[in-house]
Amino acid sequence: MQMDIIQKLENGLIVSCQALEGEPLHSPFIMAKMAKAAEIGGAVAIRANGYEDIVAIKKEVSIPVIGLIKKRYEGYAPYITPTMEEVDKVIEAGADIVAIDATKAYKPGGLTTGEFLKRIKEKYPKILVMADISTYEEGIEAEKLGFDLISTTLSGYTEYSPELEGPDYELIERLARKVNVPIIAEGRIWTPEEAVKALEKGAYAVVVGTAITRPHEITRRFVTFIKERRYSNVRAK
């Protein structure tokens, strides 16, 4: 069953359907419809944030759902499914894969990533767990710890990982050449060409979110691009 889910992702597009509180599309109903549209378009899986969103999306789509819950805890950097409380809710909501922060930062309660994963696997031995990492070293460690999938989600979003304008192709390729766990490319992928390049670098599948499901960011990108360009004088005066 676990391998069946993983195999469905191979060489495919995973669409991240997430809207943060305060954004116009912040609604389980809207995210479920967005996920359905992604499935119709050929997405192989959905990445979703929040109990209500996961429940609503699972009712709409037949493809796998990668679930997470973003929650901040004072004094701790990890915010992607950082404790067992969030893990329990993600699994209760019906997610097929649970994504967690797998960086070197301690989780709430002082747990290491390895200790946290052990607790998850002891309670839910059949659930697939995705490691959201930010560096090559974290990816290598994630395989050693026993994660089922590794995603480059947090590259550029930790204090010690490189800030890049585009996808972290170097990280994708280095991990793909070294580990046997599927590498999922995520982060700053805006075009089909960038998605294909990530696969060419060894990614097992590609996650695209903002470029598909956050229209205010897509609009802002167009507006910024237009404002930064100079125009010809071919228009009639």
Swiss-Prot record:
The keyword Isomerase applies. Pathway: Amino-sugar metabolism; N-acetylneuraminate degradation; D-fructose 6-phosphate from N-acetylneuraminate: step 3/5. Its EC number is 5.1.3.9. Keywords: Carbohydrate metabolism, Isomerase. Pfam families: NanE. GO terms for cellular component: cytosol. The keyword NADP does not apply. InterPro entries: Aldolase_TIM (IPR013785), NanE (IPR007260), RibuloseP-bd_barrel (IPR011060). GO terms for biological process: carbohydrate metabolic process; N-acetylmannosamine catabolic process; N-acetylneuraminate catabolic process. One of its GO terms (molecular function) is N-acylglucosamine-6-phosphate 2-epimerase activity. It catalyses: an N-acyl-D-glucosamine 6-phosphate = an N-acyl-D-mannosamine 6-phosphate. Gene3D superfamilies: Aldolase class I (3.20.20.70). Belongs to the NanE family. NCBIfam families: PRK01130.1 (NF002231). HAMAP family: ManNAc6P_epimer. Converts N-acetylmannosamine-6-phosphate (ManNAc-6-P) to N-acetylglucosamine-6-phosphate (GlcNAc-6-P). PANTHER family: N-ACETYLMANNOSAMINE-6-PHOSPHATE 2-EPIMERASE-RELATED (PTHR36204:SF1). This is Putative N-acetylmannosamine-6-phosphate 2-epimerase.
